[in-house]
């Protein structure tokens, strides 16, 4: 608006011809004004972008230093084979001082209820509570009826103020099935909480390295500090190394944050120039796939 007003004033002055035949504002003034406006517009956009990035990173640091958020991790249980792994994952990523931060959920489809399904759901919840108790942690068990599993998880997340959700990776049943499955996709669309999707092929406590592929500019997303802290927390709990792969700019933020807040974590940093190179990391990953999503933004 200021640039437009300045240009309009100069154009008016340029159009005024005095008695001696000269313009009130000559061509040099007009050209200088145009160059000045062009220069300031370019510089201001660059300065604004840099300032916005600094503000975002500073907000992330303040968010982590304040630590006011009460963690509550939701563990939907349906497959008995994955319960132990999901509970172990939740125990590793939770804050050690928050003993009552776990919520286990079993959802029964309201349109297809039966005593058998209710009994299976209760058994899964009982087993979840036993596994958590063995690690000196308490878990609140919830059995609920809903239209579908995704809606049941979303409603429970709202009712219990859940901050994180840990679920197992969908198992494809046919060629037309998507990678994440309908339930997970609906869950990603319906909630703005951090979701960890894990496929564990061996017990969590036997892991010796955590490989993290980070997309470009992930440091400017709201949940960046949170999931980075939780992965480093898992690394400290397991006594294993956390290996980050990211672009050069993102690696700078990761190094700075880990040195400041996670100095006791064993970390490595490697350059990942293009996201298409993600398949090159498969040689580093043998036993675990962990996918993290926060709100509408995805991170691996």
What are these regions (language model features)?
Residues 1-75, 81, 120, 167, ...:
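Membrane-interfacial segments at transmembrane helix termini in multi-pass membrane proteins
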Residues 2, 39, 135, 191, ...:
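Single, functionally critical "micro-switch" positions that shape active/binding sites
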Residues 6, 184, 297:
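Short, flexible micro-motifs
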């Amino acid at each position: 608006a200021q640039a437009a007003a300045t240009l309009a004033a100069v154009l008016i002055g340029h159009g005024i011809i005095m008695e001696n035949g000269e313009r009130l504002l000559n061509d040099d003034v007009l050209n200088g004004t145009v160059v000045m406006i062009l220069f300031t517009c370019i510089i201001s956009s660059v300065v604004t972008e840099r300032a916005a990035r600094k503000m975002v990173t500073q907000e992330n640091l303040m968010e982590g230093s304040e630590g006011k958020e009460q963690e509550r991790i939701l563990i939907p249980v349906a497959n008995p084979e994955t319960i132990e792994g999901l509970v172990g994952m939740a125990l590793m990523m939770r804050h050690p001082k928050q003993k009552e931060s776990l919520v286990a959920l079993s959802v029964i489809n309201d349109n297809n209820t039966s005593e058998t399904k209710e009994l299976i759901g209760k058994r899964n919840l009982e087993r979840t509570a036993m596994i958590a108790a063995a690690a000196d942690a308490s878990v609140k068990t919830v059995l609920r009826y809903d239209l579908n599993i995704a809606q049941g998880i979303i409603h429970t997340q709202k009712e219990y103020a859940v901050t994180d959700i840990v679920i197992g990776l969908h198992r494809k049943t046919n060629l037309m099935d998507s990678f994440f499955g309908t339930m997970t996709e609906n869950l990603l669309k319906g909630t703005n909480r951090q979701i960890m999707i894990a496929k564990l092929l061996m017990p969590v406590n036997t892991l010796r390295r955590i490989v993290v592929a980070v997309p470009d500019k992930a440091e400017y997303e709201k949940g960046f500090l949170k999931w980075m802290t939780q992965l480093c927390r898992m690394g400290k709990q397991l006594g294993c190394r956390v290996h980050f792969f990211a672009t050069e700019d993102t690696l700078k933020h990761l190094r700075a944050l880990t040195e400041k807040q996670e100095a006791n974590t064993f970390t490595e940093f490697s350059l990942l120039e293009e996201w298409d190179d993600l398949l090159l990391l498969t040689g580093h990953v043998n036993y675990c796939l962990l996918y993290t999503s926060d709100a509408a933004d995805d991170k691996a």
